[in-house]
Every structure is written in structure tokens, then in C-alpha cells.
């Protein structure tokens, strides 16, 4: 090989100085700083997502707080209401202990006393009802262990089996909870009861007397 072949020609310098424009653009793109507008957009999207999450959490907290306050208000009276129902039961027992003859032919003083006791009972139950305590309408309903407590069974083929025939002590609810179940006697031996349309028995006015 001669010395001429070893020496780089003029074209070699040009080749070394030549840079591919596409490659140069890629290198510039890699080294270029991020677009501030895109950074702001990404930051704004992140802040918006955090705000929406925080707003949802605050709304859930507000709903829970309102529900807790409502429940506390409704059920804080449960113990007091239960005690008042015991007083009402005693008034009812006192009235039922009076013979019918005395009620019919009793003296004016006795009749006035009976009317006073009945008025006191109605007033007490009416006051409890205004505070959310409602009487369970049990008689004639299908027995429901969630609302009724069976005390005895009565053979009766004229009504569907497990129908409440008699209420020994009225039951009550407060809000959506059972304050005390109704003590009842249920039918036995009749046809099978049809499924009830509603799982929850109705309620009636507290001013109605126990069956």
C-alpha cells in the first residue's frame, strides 16, 4: 500500500463535519427543556383531581355527620320512652282491672277518676308519638319475629297459620328500630299463611288502646 492511500483525502474532512439533520433534531429534542404550558396543564389536571376527591370526601363526611346527629336525636330518647311505656302499661292495667259494672253504674267521682286516667294515658302516648315512638299494628298480621314475641299459640283453623290473634302487650318502634316487640298470641293449625306484601308491619296511632 502506498503513502497516498494512507493519507485522508479532502472528502474525509467533509464527512467528519457533516451531521445528519434528523439525528441532530432528535438530540436537541432530548436535551430541550419541557414545555411550560404542558407542565401547567398537567399540574392543573392533578390539582383538579385532588380537589374533586377532597370535595367528595367532604360531602360524604357531611352526610355521615347529618345521619349521626339525626340518629343520636332519635335514639337518645329510647331509654326514657321505654320507661314511659311501662307507666302507660300500668295505667292500662288499672283501667282494665275496674269491673264493667262499676264503669257503667259507678258514682260520678269514680267515673271522673276513670276519665282522668284514660286522658293521662292518651296524652302520654300522644307525646311519645310526636317524638317518633309508634305503636306496632300487630293484631291480624302475620307473625314476624322482628316485631312480635309469641307468648302462646291458639288452635284456630279459620285463619292462616301464625296469624297474630291477640296482643298481650303492645309493641313500639322508634325511628326504624324496635323499641320493644309486641307480646302476642298466634294461631296454630290453619292454612299456611301467604307471604306478606311488606316485610315490615304497619304502625298505628299510639292513642289506640292495646288489644
Swiss-Prot record:
GO molecular function: adenyl-nucleotide exchange factor activity; protein homodimerization activity; protein-folding chaperone binding; unfolded protein binding
Disordered: annotated segments: 1-37, 187-211
Keywords: Chaperone, Cytoplasm, Stress response
Ranges of biased composition (kind: Basic and acidic residues): 1-10
Single Gene Ontology BP annotation: protein folding
GO cellular component entries: cytoplasm
Disulfide bond listed as a keyword: no
Quaternary assembly: Homodimer.
Family: Belongs to the GrpE family.
Name of the featured protein: Protein GrpE
Higher taxonomy: Bacteria, Pseudomonadati, Pseudomonadota, Alphaproteobacteria, Hyphomicrobiales
Gene transcribed to yield this protein: grpE
Amino acid at each position: 500500500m502506498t503513502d497516498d492511500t494512507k493519507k485522508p483525502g479532502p472528502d474525509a474532512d467533509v464527512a467528519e463535519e457533516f451531521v445528519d439533520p434528523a439525528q441532530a433534531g432528535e438530540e436537541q429534542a432530548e436535551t430541550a427543556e419541557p414545555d411550560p404550558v404542558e407542565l401547567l396543564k398537567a399540574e392543573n389536571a392533578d390539582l383538579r383531581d385532588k380537589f374533586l376527591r377532597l370535595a367528595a370526601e367532604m360531602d360524604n363526611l357531611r352526610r355521615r355527620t347529618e345521619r349521626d346527629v339525626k340518629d343520636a336525636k332519635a335514639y337518645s330518647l329510647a331509654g326514657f320512652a321505654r320507661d314511659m311505656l311501662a307507666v302507660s302499661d300500668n295505667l292500662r292495667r288499672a283501667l282494665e282491672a275496674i269491673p264493667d259494672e262499676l264503669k257503667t253504674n259507678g258514682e260520678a267521682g269514680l267515673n271522673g277518676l276513670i276519665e282522668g286516667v284514660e286522658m293521662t294515658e292518651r296524652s302520654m302516648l300522644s307525646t311519645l308519638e310526636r317524638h317518633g315512638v309508634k305503636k306496632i299494628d300487630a293484631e291480624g298480621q302475620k307473625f314476624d319475629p322482628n316485631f312480635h314475641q309469641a307468648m302462646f299459640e291458639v288452635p284456630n283453623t279459620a285463619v292462616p297459620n301464625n296469624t297474630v290473634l291477640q296482643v298481650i302487650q303492645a309493641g313500639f318502634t322508634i325511628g326504624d328500630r324496635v323499641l320493644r316487640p309486641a307480646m302476642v298470641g298466634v294461631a296454630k293449625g290453619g292454612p299456611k299463611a301467604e307471604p306478606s306484601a311488606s316485610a315490615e308491619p304497619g304502625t298505628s296511632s299510639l292513642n289506640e288502646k292495646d288489644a
